[in-house]
From Swiss-Prot:
Protein name: Photosystem I reaction center subunit IV
Record keyword Cell membrane present: no
UniProt keyword terms in alphabetical order: Membrane, Photosynthesis, Photosystem I, Thylakoid
Pfam families given in the database record: PSI_PsaE
Family that this chain belongs to: Belongs to the PsaE family.
Membrane topology, as annotated: Peripheral membrane protein
SUPFAM superfamilies membership: Electron transport accessory proteins
Predominant location category: membrane
Organism: Synechococcus sp. (strain CC9605)
An individual GO BP term: photosynthesis
Disulfide bonds: none
Length: 69
């Protein structure tokens, strides 16, 4: 199955903060880069400063690291 923009996907990269979480495909790069799929999540990761709203809620993945949710 081809991943398309707006699709809900589950992350299968074990070292990822979002492993087994569901996110939405924000964009897909077709230029041949290693991690072409940008996935957006509802929650942010741990890189935000303590006591300050922030953090990252997107990450790039390869299509092989994603499965439809």
């Amino acid at each position: 199955m081809a991943i398309t923009r707006g699709a809900k996907v589950r992350i299968k990269r074990p070292e990822s903060y979002w492993f087994n979480e569901v996110g939405t495909v924000a964009s897909i790069d077709t230029s041949g880069i290693r991690y072409p799929v940008v996935v957006r999540f509802e929650k942010v990761n741990y890189s935000g400063l303590q006591g300050v709203d922030g953090g990252i809620n997107t990450n790039n993945f390869a299509e092989a690291e994603l499965e439809p949710a």
